[in-house]
Design a protein with these regions (language model features):
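N-terminal leader segment of winged-helix/HTH proteins
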Residues: 1-48
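Helix-turn-helix DNA-binding motif, specifically the short coil turn and the N-cap/start of the second
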Residues: 64, 78-81
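Residues within the DNA-recognition helix of helix-turn-helix
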Residues: 85
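Beta-hairpin "wing" of winged helix-turn-helix
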Residues: 90-100
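Residues within the alpha-helical elements of helix-turn-helix
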Residues: 60, 74
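A cross-family signal for key residues in well-ordered alpha-helices
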Residues: 47, 56-59, 90
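Short capping segments at the starts of secondary-structure elements
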Residues: 52-55, 63-69
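Conserved segment of winged-helix/HTH DNA-binding domains
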Residues: 42, 105-125
Length: 125
């Protein structure tokens, strides 16, 4: 949406108020696009990180491989809950998975995590 379109959507009183502040807001071009949305991938990433268990898993696994039972014990959570969070993290490619027989071990995919952090920085800073 352009600044001009935003102004046109306001009532007369609001428009006068906003027009007074345009220079102070350093908005000089009424055709400038105002972007308000993040990409879907970034929204999903922020949602994933907003959960303290998932954030804890990523932090705990940044330098080590661990199995589900150890992760559950370290976070004092039920193993089925941890498995649910691991699936969510794997779906976003934020975890590496290694299998040894029936056991599965997990580690944070730092390259993918860095990619999301870079995208977030690029969008917001």
């Amino acid at each position: 949406m352009k600044v001009r379109e935003i102004l046109e959507s306001l009532n007369e009183k609001q428009r006068r108020t906003v027009q007074k502040c345009l220079a102070s807001c350093e908005i000089l071009d009424l055709e400038e696009e105002v972007v308000t949305e993040l990409s879907g991938d970034l929204i999903d990433f922020v949602k994933v990180l907003s959960n303290p268990i998932r954030a804890g898993i990523l932090k705990m696994l940044k330098n080590r491989w661990m199995c589900v039972c150890l992760i559950a014990k370290a976070l004092n959570q039920d193993q089925t809950l941890i498995s649910h969070h691991l699936r969510t993290l794997k779906r976003m490619n934020l975890l590496h998975e290694r299998r040894e027989g029936k056991l599965r071990f997990y580690r944070t995919n730092l390259e993918e995590l860095k990619k999301y952090v870079y995208m977030l920085e690029k969008e917001l800073l």
